[in-house]
Amino acid sequence: MSIYLELTNEFNADGLRAILSSGQAVVLHRLAVMSKDGDWILRESPEALDAIRNVLDRRCAHYRYGAPLDVRWMRGGWSSHFEFRLDALRVRTDFVTRPPRLTADDLAGLWREQAGCATPVVDPRRLAELKKTNREKDYAVIGELTRLLDDPRQQFLLSRSAQDLMALARTHPNLARQLATARPLLEQAGRSVEALEAALDAERRKLMHANERRLLRYMTAAEPWAEHWPAVAAEIAGLPLRQAHAVVTARAEGLLPFELPDGIP
């Protein structure tokens, strides 16, 4: 069992608190052999975050640059990052409670669906939304995740393959026309492969730029915190996580806003 599955089990030892996401979720869906970091979506409650920090404390984890694992920041869409050593392996863990591009209703549905699962993991459809990042490689992953879906509506909205979309349009022409309002490039699905591929490329660039703008808003808001972080990191070096957390939280107050001025992008 990988360390990331072990951690997932520990996080959820006495109740569902953490759902495996991002690269490790891609591994669990058998679309990758490995991923170097671990990402989780956490329940947004002080009790859940306390439990996660306790697990990390037992692993002798330390904070990396990011927001404190505190509900005041997490509800603003910030992320928290930690690291620990396991023999020769450097284990990095990343956490959010409000992942990008998932609505509140969709996130609530994810928690309902994963209740009782042996290994809670983000499903392919939602994972495809999370993978709409500014990294080129993630769009190939979205394409493969879409091929795991059975619902033609979801396939139309997420597929990255011109060939797949044209085949779908031949099978479901009315649905393709209906969904063209939500995804305009579907208007090209009955034309040429070249036109549809060009539309897919343009859409990918648009999605990448949108995520770049989202990240820039957080980076700009975090500039005072980033400036002070080296001193904070030196202050907490060698401290147990439970003590380091108190220091990080106290130092972040007033430097890192709980929420962005215009809300979560």
Describe each model-derived feature in a short phrase:
Residues 1-265:
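Compositionally biased terminal segments of proteins
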